[in-house]
Each structure stands twice: as structure tokens, then as C-alpha cells.
Regions:
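Cysteine-dependent hydrolase recognition
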Residues: 31-204, 208, 253, 271-523
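Alpha-helical protein-protein interaction modules
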Residues: 180-263, 276-277
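Short, compositionally biased P/S/T/A/G/V-rich stretches that sit at domain boundaries
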Residues: 491-525, 529, 588-611, 681-684
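Surface-exposed, short loops/turns at beta-strand junctions within beta-sandwich domains
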Residues: 559-566, 649-656, 784
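Conserved structural position at the C-terminal beta-strand
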Residues: 573, 663, 792-794
Length: 828
């Protein structure tokens, strides 16, 4: 079924500055390369910057494609207004100002951006239908950005994604009107509450209006059976099968159809459905500028819906992974790219509703993978067991223990579990989180951020793995497999494409490090095409797309339009295959049209701790000043034509980084010289040693709150709600909160703090931070294995003091009895 309304949302705009005469950009072009990805980072979060730095370094994402946000209200959940006007709109505005918007096809989020979006305010009286739910995911809503900015709520439609590769049913399904879709949703809500008579009335009317809809007839059959009308139910089920319904497992396990199971007609219909093998639609290349029609085809006239691929690289708070786990995951994924790994795709089948809602398609998915030369297998149970070769997994279970399966997830794998709360990653969540897949080796995983009501359109179809194996990148594969992605949180490396057959590209006439003047040409030499051809080439200079050349035309550009100094020339070949595979080559060059340069004393630095200043010395004759930038952010300035500056590396974050030097020759900063990039690695400071070892069994599982002199200390067992100071009698008083905690290994851990006042946080006697009121602040601490001491000092406001403090390595949790101790137990 297809529901479509006019899209009146935000649309990406951008221009390409042509430096040569070449192919016009009226039609955009497909594929996904690092130049097409925008990286969104929480500038206040150590974890966010560390994971983003790794992704940028692994994939050579251009510095201009990285956008930083700060002072976010929450890193877990945002309002719909904050999502639109505090996250997506500012990011797209920056990309437009940098002249990059037209080339961006994917927004990828680093950790500590809100995972969920509260969409209740988009509905009348803040009350969305039960079938819709209160929350969307940041990745799903970003993908549906046009609809999300439209002022309507059609982004929650079960067929909101026109890029979705619909299963090729024997009979084409009709398009429902907006009114009919609303009526259908109301009927589903009535069935949830066992109001069979009213639901049957709605569904009977819809069946009359849309007699070709297999799904309407199926739901009508369920409703009639539950109401005790067996003959009417069988008649409706027969109509459903005649119109293409084929999910025998859903019929077998529907609790509403139990009264029909012994009827001969029912068994005949089951046999008819079981004989059907369906095929997925052909894969399609993605570009945000491609418009999609209600039938899932690319609109030749450009009139249709547009999308932005989106994933979150990692989640490192709540029930998330550690930063080290996230970085390891990204490195495994990068190595798997275009590696054509060998192994098996597994589909785990069991009697849980979470399985039966999708596993009717398992045989067809296995057949599709076999036709591609891949190994695929249906296994009975919750997990594949004792399998050392898991290339991908589709499950349906509330909870699972992957280590207990003795199976091995191979690099590049996508793992997907149909369950209610796999994407609810805040602490105290239910069911196994999607992050367990990433912890044990997957490149990507997904889960819904709110109760999905077992609606299959909200999850990937089992054909997800077939799209991935066809050469699509991870992000493309996910969004071709999900009809209604608004609740689905997708986590992983969007660029990972293990089965992409990338060509090898080199350039003749442009050597690395070459000095160029005036007009220059480059002759691409491409191998590894097989029977394919290059459709066209894209020219990028310093990460910005400058031109597009048809195959057969010699790419060229005029360097006089560039500042003197160091630049990077990238040529991307886009092939004429189904997914518009891309191959690229990057060449560093030096432009010298005016004989000007910037001198930097040291351009390569060994590891530098983030708590040490980076001293930069540079000169450029005649300069008004020299800017020092990291990912287009100005971190410091050297005044005049020579001098030094000290940079605070905490702004850069942990990991590999490049500090760009740019000399400014006029007051308006329009005349510049591009100096060399200082390459360095930012590392943690020395580990804080553990305090004297203690037996945790002899300690009390509490923290101790002391207040003004003469008042007895109070034990604190839980701080999750944030109002613990007021409940403990500390309102308006000076206080000290102390506790002990143990870390299992050497490494970097993090505290997350937010309050309506500014306390002082210290670890092992060293001040870690004094967060300003109103915002989450993130403090990394390098700790040796063993016991450590935390202390919080402050004066609580007299009126409703609020303070939340979280700590962790693999995710984060509120300070409390589960992980913190004290040497003396005090009566509460």
C-alpha cells in the first residue's frame, strides 16, 4: 500500500562552482563516497569527538564535511522542534554556507547526539495514535527530513519511504488515500483493544473501497475470526490470498485465526501461500537529489520525495558500547569494505511473534541470496549456534546471549533483531539492546526507539542482506529494506560495503606533491571495471565538488581560482551499474601562482596528551594573521605574519587529527594562502593510579552525602531522577557527595553531568570539571584498573535542586548502589 501527500518540507540546496566547462548539474548523480557524507559531532562530548575523529581518519572524510553542535539540551532525547531547529537545520545551514549541501547524501551522527525524538508535539493535543507512538529515531527522522519539515505527520506513514524496494507481489497493490490510511490505523487500534465489532465495520468499508488490497482483507479476516464469524473470516482470508497475500507464517501464528486452523479451507489457503516464493525489487542507487515516485521508481522529472541517508556511528552512553569498542567496530568495518568476505547469512526462526511476523519471507530471502552465489541458511531457534561464519543475521526474540551461541560475527556483517525495545538505549532499558551486536563484531545493527506494535514495516525486511550483498553500502541497504523507518535507530558505519566491486583509479599527468600553475589536466586510468563502464567523473578540490565530466572527456581545472598553497585533488569515477559504484583517487598538490607560502616549524607531531597545549609556530610574509583550524573550526590565531599560538587539544578530541594553517592576507579574509597541515595524534594523559585495594564485599553499596556541620550524613542509593538532593534535605545547603568505584581495566572512562547549578567534580582528589548550569557536560578520566574515589562539592539551590551524574566505560549509568560504594554504612 502507498500513502502519499504533497511534500512541503526542507529541501537541500547548493551550487557547484564550475572552474571549467563541463557537464551541467541539472541532474544529480548517484553513489556514496566520503565526500558525500556529513559528520555531525557533539562538540561538548569527548566520546563524540573521539569516535568522529576515527571515522574521519578511516574514510578520509573532508574537514569541511564535519559539523559541530554544542549546548544540546539532551544527548538521549530531543523534542521535534529541537531536532528540526537545533540539530538538522543548523547542520544543513552550515553545509550550505560552505557550498557543500548539493553533494551531501548522508548525515551520520557521532555518539552523544539525541537517539530519540519526541514527536508528540506534532499531533493535535500532543496525542499521536497508538499505532504511531510518541517517539521517532534521529536516524529515521533525518532520512525523512523533507516530510519531517513539512508541518504534517506523514513521516509516520507505513509507506513513507518511496526508496523502499517493495517485494514484487504477484498482484500490484493499490494506493490508499490519506483518509483510508487513517481509517486503517484506527481499525488496528481497535483490534489492539479487542473492539472487534467496530474494527470489523471499519475494515469491511475499506475492503469495499479498496478490493485489491491484500493486507486489508487479511486484517479483516483476523477481525472476523476474533469476533466468532468463522465463515466470513475464511472468505476474507481467501480474498487476501487471491490478491497476493503470501505470509503463511503470519497466518499460522495469528492468535486471531486460531478458530480457523482445523478448517479444510484454511489448510488449503496455507498450502497455497507456502508455495509462493517472492522476489525483492532490484536494488537502486541513492542520491539525495534523486526524487522517488509512489511506485518506488526514480522520477525522471525530479518531482517526488527526497531523502538523506542517516546512521549513528555508535552509542556510548546508557546501554551502549565503550569508545574503544566503537573504534574497534569502525576499524573492522573499514577493513571489510570491498573485501567480498565469505561466510553465511543466517535467519533464525522460532515460535515467538517477533519471528513469525517476518519469517514467512525467510525462504524467499535465502533463495535470493543463493541466486547471487551467497551462502544463506534458515536455523531453528533464537540464534545461529556454533557458526563461525556469520556474515549477517536476522532474528526475532526479546533477549539473546550472543557469547552463549558460540557463533562468530564476521567483519562487515549486519545483524537485525525484531523486538520492541532494541533501540531504547537509555539505562534501565528492557530487552537486549542493538549495541550487543556491535560489541561482538557487527558493522551495523538497528532497533526501534519506542513500542513498534509488531508492525513489520517498521523493521528491515529479510531482503536487507540481499541488497547489502548486491554491492550497496550499509546505509543504502537498510533504507531499501524499511518501508516506515521513522522509529528505527540505525547504528553503524554507513559507508561499509563489503560486496562493492570498486574500480581502481589513478591519474596520469598529476603526481602526488606536484606543483601546479594555471590550467591543469588529469587523465584517469581505471581498472577493475569488468563489463561495466565509467558513466562520469566528479572532480573534488579540498572536499568540495567543483565539476562533473562525462566519460571520455579529459578532466581539467584552473588553479588560478585557488589560493596558493596545499590542496587535495580528488577524482571520483561513477560506474554505470545498478548501485552506481564509485572508485576514487586523491592527490595532494601545491598551487603556486603567486609565489606565496606559509612556513610551519613542525608539521608532524608525535602523540600529544589532550591536557597539554599544542604550541604552533608559523610565518607567512605580509600576512595579517595565520588561522589554525581543525575541521573548519578556528582553534587559534597567530597575529601578524609570524609568531606562535597555543591550542587546547580538548577541543580537538582524542585520535588522529590535522590542524590546518591558513594565512590571511587582507582584512576581509578573501585573500589567503593555504599552509601545510600539522598531523598529530591526541592521546589520553597518564592514568590516574588506583587507590589502595579494598574488598568490595566489605563495603556498603551506597554513596555518602554530608551537609552542613552538625547534620548527620545521609546514604544515597540512587541519583537517576535528579531530585535526590532535595529529597535528602540538601536544598539550599553546601554539600559533599562521596563514593568509591572500581574499574575493570586500564582505560578512559567518562562522567556525564547536568544540573541547575555548578558543582565541582573530582576524581582521586583531582578536579575534573565544574559544569555550568543547564547543559550536559562530558568529562573523560584516564584511570588505572582498580578502585577510585569520586567527590562532588557544591551548594544546592534552595528551590528544586536538580543534579544528574552518570559514569561508565561500556555505556554510562547514574551514580548509585549498583556501581558505587562507601567504607562506612550510615543509616538513611
Amino acid at each position: 500500500m502507498r500513502l502519499r501527500m504533497a511534500r512541503r518540507g526542507l529541501r537541500l540546496a547548493g551550487t557547484v562552482n564550475m572552474c571549467v566547462v563541463c557537464l551541467a548539474l541539472a541532474a544529480a548523480h548517484g553513489g556514496l563516497a566520503p565526500e558525500n557524507v556529513a559528520m555531525v559531532v557533539n562538540a561538548d562530548s569527548w566520546a563524540s569527538k573521539a569516535v568522529a575523529n576515527e571515522f574521519v581518519a578511516l574514510h578520509h572524510v573532508p574537514p569541511g564535511n564535519v559539523v559541530y553542535l554544542s549546548n544540546l539540551d539532551s544527548y538521549e532525547r530531543a523534542s521535534a522542534d529541537t531536532f528540526r531547529n537545533g540539530i538538522v537545520k543548523p547542520v544543513l545551514t552550515v553545509l550550505t554556507q560552505r557550498g557543500l549541501a548539493a553533494q551531501i547524501d548522508c548525515l551520520v551522527y557521532a555518539p552523544d547526539l539525541p537517539m530519540a525524538v519526541d514527536i508528540r508535539g506534532d499531533f493535535p493535543e500532543g496525542n499521536p495514535p497508538e499505532s504511531v507512538g510518541p517517539f521517532a529515531s534521529i536516524t529515521g527522522l533525518t532520512y525523512l527530513y523533507e516530510a519531517a519539515f513539512s508541518g504534517e505527520t506523514e513521516y509516520t506513514g507505513l509507506d513513507a519511504n518511496r526508496y523502499y524496494r517493495a517485494i514484487e507481489l504477484p498482484i500490484e497493490q493499490p494506493t490508499l488515500t490519506a483518509k483510508q490510511m487513517t481509517t486503517f490505523a484506527e481499525a488496528m487500534g481497535l483490534m489492539q483493544h479487542w473492539e472487534w465489532a467496530r474494527a470489523c465495520t471499519f475494515l469491511a468499508a475499506l475492503a469495499e473501497e479498496q478490493p485489491g488490497s491484500a493486507l486489508i482483507h487479511f486484517r479483516h479476516a483476523e477481525c472476523r475470526a476474533a469476533a466468532g464469524e468463522a465463515d466470513a473470516a475464511l472468505a476474507a482470508l481467501a480474498k487476501s490470498v487471491d490478491r497476493g497475500f503470501h505470509n503463511a507464517r503470519a497466518v499460522q501464528h495469528s492468535p486471531h485465526l486460531v478458530p480457523l486452523r482445523e478448517r479444510a479451507e484454511f489448510k488449503e489457503l496455507l498450502a497455497k501461500m507456502e508455495a509462493v516464493v517472492v522476489k525483492p525489487a532490484l536494488v537502486a542507487a541513492f542520491r539525495h537529489a534523486y526524487a522517488w515516485t509512489p511506485s518506488g521508481k526514480r522520477a525522471a522529472d525530479g518531482k517526488g520525495d527526497r531523502y538523506l541517508l542517516s546512521t549513528m556511528l555508535a552509542v556510548t552512553s546508557g546501554r551502549g558500547n565503550s569508545v574503544d569498542e566503537a573504534i574497534t567496530c569502525l576499524r573492522r568495518s573499514a577493513k571489510a569494505d570491498a573485501a567480498s568476505p565469505e561466510g553465511t547469512f543466517y535467519f533464525a526462526r522460532n515460535e515467538d511473534d517477533r519471528s513469525t511476523v517476518r519469517d514467512g519471507l525467510y525462504p524467499s530471502a535465502v533463495s535470493a541470496l543463493h541466486a547471487m552465489g551467497m551462502q544463506a541458511e534458515i536455523v531453528e531457534g533464537e540464534l545461529p549456534t556454533n557458526r563461525p561464519d556469520v556474515l549477517g543475521a536476522t532474528l526475532g526474540t526479546a533477549s539473546f546471549d550472543w557469547p552463549g551461541s558460540d557463533s562468530v560475527i564476521l567483519p562487515g556483517a549486519i545483524c537485525d533483531n525484531f523486538t520492541r525495545y532494541g533501540g531504547v538505549l537509555a539505562e534501565k532499558g528492557e530487552e537486549t539492546p542493538l549495541t550487543d551486536f556491535l560489541r561482538f563484531g557487527a558493522a551495523g545493527a538497528c532497533g526501534t526507539v519506542a513500542e513498534p506494535l509488531a508492525v513489520p514495516q517498521k523493521f528491515p525486511s529479510p531482503f536487507l542482506h540481499a541488497y547489502y550483498a548486491a554491492g550497496c553500502c550499509l546505509a543504502e541497504a537498510f533504507y531499501q529494506a524499511v518501508a516506515a523507518p521513522y522509529q528505527l535507530l540505525v547504528v553503524g558505519d554507513p559507508l561499509c560495503a563489503p560486496w562493492a566491486e570498486r574500480p581502481t583509479l589513478s591519474l596520469e599527468g598529476l603526481e602526488p606533491g606536484a606543483e601546479i600553475k594555471g590550467r591543469f589536466e588529469m587523465r584517469p586510468v581505471i581498472t577493475g571495471l569488468g563489463e561495466r563502464e565509467a558513466a562520469y567523473y566528479e572532480l573534488y578540490i579540498d572536499g568540495a565538488r567543483r565539476a562533473i565530466f562525462p566519460s571520455g572527456q579529459t578532466p581539467a581545472a584552473d588553479s588560478s581560482q585557488l589560493a596558493d598553497g596545499f590542496h587535495e585533488i580528488a577524482l571520483v569515477a561513477v560506474l554505470d551499474d545498478a548501485v552506481e559504484t564509485r572508485g576514487w583517487v586523491r592527490v595532494p598538490v601545491r598551487v603556486n601562482n603567486k609565489g606565496r607560502s606559509v612556513t610551519v616549524r613542525e608539521t608532524k607531531r608525535a602523540a600529544v596528551a589532550w591536557d597539554e597545549p599544542l604550541v604552533v609556530r608559523a610565518s607567512a610574509p605580509g600576512a595579517k594573521g595565520i588561522l589554525l583550524l581543525h575541521n573548519r573550526r578556528i582553534l587559534g590565531t597567530i597575529p601578524g605574519e609570524a609568531g606562535m599560538a597555543e591550542l587546547d587539544l580538548r577541543a580537538v578530541g582524542q585520535g588522529l587529527a590535522g590542524i590546518r594553517t591558513i594565512a590571511v592576507m587582507d582584512e576581509n579574509r578573501t585573500d589567503t594562502i593555504f599552509g601545510p597541515t600539522i598531523e598529530l595524534e591526541v592521546v589520553p594523559p597518564p592514568l590516574s593510579p588506583a587507590i589502595e585495594a579494598m574488598d568490595t564485599e566489605a563495603l556498603a553499596p551506597v554513596l555518602i552525602l554530608t551537609m552542613e556541620e552538625g547534620e548527620p550524613p545521609v546514604t544515597i542509593a540512587e541519583t537517576w531522577a535528579g531530585d535526590w538532593l532535595g529529597k535528602s534535605g540538601a536544598a539550599g545547603k553546601a554539600f559533599s557527595l562521596e563514593g568509591l568505584f572500581e574499574v575493570p581495566a586500564d582505560g578512559v572512562y567518562q562522567f556525564q553531568v547536568r544540573g541547575n547549578f555548578s558543582p565541582e567534580l573530582s576524581v582521586d582528589g583531582e578536579t575534573v570539571g565544574r559544569p555550568e548550569p543547564g547543559y550536559w557536560r562530558f568529562y573523560p578520566v584516564a584511570l588505572a584498573k582498580g578502585m577510585h574515589r569520586v567527590r562532588v562539592l557544591g551548594v544546592a539551590p534552595a528551590d528544586h535542586p536538580d543534579l544528574k551524574i552518570r559514569f561508565g566505560g561500556k555505556g554510562t549509568h547514574s551514580l548509585g548502589k549498583d556501581r558505587f560504594f562507601h567504607t562506612v554504612e550510615v543509616k538513611p
